[in-house]
């Protein structure tokens, strides 16, 4: 059984990253997306790809926490990294109004600029959205999209089935993290039942959000097996079948 973790972050310590990647391989996680979002996260994701170029796909971007930095400098650096590296996606990008609603305008501008970049260079996007459904939908609808097929993935989905349907209609896949295993996450489970097989992805969002039964531990890609097992039971599927379909979906998106 092969598993594709579509969203993992890494630290700066190369030895630790190598060990995390080795444990992932032992657990059957044969591919993953190392995701950036800041100068530090982008550098760490690049390092992960350098350590395991066969297994690691790379997403480079500027997340909502970079929204108050000089926009021209941020976008220039993102363009430079995409020109110099073999990237599979632009990300993570998007909106989070939970902690910093006061930067909503700047977040939307940075989000839109990177959507336009992804369209220009022909890559999918990895989107974060939290307490920003209307704004996310608005930016997605404002930015022209000239590519064919799927536009990207809404990662670590925590919304209702109704918003998931709107995202699916706009050409996105939907990815579920260990949150779906949490006792309080009934709405997330409803969405996980709703998303069709050909749009479903799985992730860790490590080092955060370790799934049950690993809660309280530092998350890592190897733990995605627990989320796969949980989703298979939730969707009344075999574990190996769910791993296979999410792997195929991820390969179609990221290679």
Map each language-model feature to its residues:
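Mid-domain alpha/beta scaffold segments of enzyme catalytic cores
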Residues: 1-255
């Amino acid at each position: 059984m092969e598993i594709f973790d579509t969203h993992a972050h890494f630290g700066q310590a190369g030895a630790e990253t190598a060990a995390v990647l080795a444990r992932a391989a032992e657990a059957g996680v044969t591919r993953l997306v190392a995701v950036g979002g800041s100068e530090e996260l982008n550098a760490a994701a690049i390092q992960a790809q350098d350590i395991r170029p066969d297994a690691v796909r790379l997403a480079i971007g500027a997340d909502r926490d970079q929204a108050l930095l000089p926009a021209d400098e941020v976008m220039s650096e993102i363009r430079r990294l995409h020109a110099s590296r073999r990237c599979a996606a632009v990300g993570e990008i998007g909106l989070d109004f939970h902690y910093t609603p006061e930067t909503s305008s700047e977040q939307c501008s940075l989000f839109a600029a990177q959507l336009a970049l992804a369209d220009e260079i022909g890559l999918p996007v990895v989107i974060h959205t939290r307490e920003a459904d209307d704004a996310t939908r608005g930016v997605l609808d404002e930015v022209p999209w000239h590519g064919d097929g799927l536009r990207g993935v809404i990662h670590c989905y925590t919304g209702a089935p109704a918003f998931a349907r709107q995202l699916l209609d706009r050409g996105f896949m939907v990815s579920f993290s260990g949150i779906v295993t949490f006792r309080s996450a009934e709405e997330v489970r409803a969405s996980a039942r709703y998303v069709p097989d050909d749009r479903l992805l799985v992730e860790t969002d490590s080092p955060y959000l370790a799934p049950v039964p690993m809660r309280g531990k530092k998350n890592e890609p190897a733990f995605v097996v627990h989320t796969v097992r949980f989703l298979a039971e939730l969707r009344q599927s075999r574990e190996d079948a769910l791993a296979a379909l999410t792997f195929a979906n991820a390969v179609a998106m990221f290679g």
